[in-house]
Amino acid sequence: MPKPKDTFIPNTPDELTAAWVGEALRGAGETCTVDDIRVEPLGGGVGMTGQTVRVRIEGDGAPATAVAKFAASQAQTRGITESYDSYAREIRFYERYAERVPVRTPKYLGADYDPGTHGQPGPVVVRIIESLPVGVKRWISRNTVKYLRPTKRRYALLIEDMGDAGAVYG
C-alpha cells in the first residue's frame, strides 16, 4: 500500500535498515524481530529495470534471507519503467495476486511506496494520438523516450529469497 510522504521508505540498497525490514515483515503478517541485516549484490547487468539485492537477516522468527528490490539508479531506465507504473504494479502484484497464481512465485514479505500517479496518458491524449498519421505516431514513439524523466517516488519491495532458481528450474 502507498505510504504517506513523510514515512521513511528506503530508495536504494544503501538506505535499507533493520528497522524497515522488521516493519515490512510484520506489516505482511510475519511475527518476528529483526536485529541486524547484511545486504549483498544479487543479479544486475543486462535486462534489469531496478536494483536487486539479497538481504541476510538476523532476528527471532525472521526468514534467514530475503530479496529486496528498488527502482533503477539509471535515470533513463527509471523514467521508462515509471512511465508504465511498473514498480508500483510489481508491488501490487505481490500484495494482491501472487498467492493466487498457479506457478511458484516468491512469497510477499512486505513493501512500501509513495502514493502518486503513474505516467500513463489520459483518455483524451490517447484519442489524439490515435487520430494521428502512422508516420507521426512512429516519430513520437521513437523520440518520447528521450524526454522521460524519473520521479522522486520511492519504491521498496521485500520478497522471499528462492535461492538459485537456475538450479531448480535450469
Label the model's feature ranges.
Residues M1-M48, R56-T65:
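Regulatory N- and C-terminal appendages and interdomain linkers associated
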Residues E40-G170:
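Conserved ATP-binding subdomain of kinase catalytic cores across diverse folds
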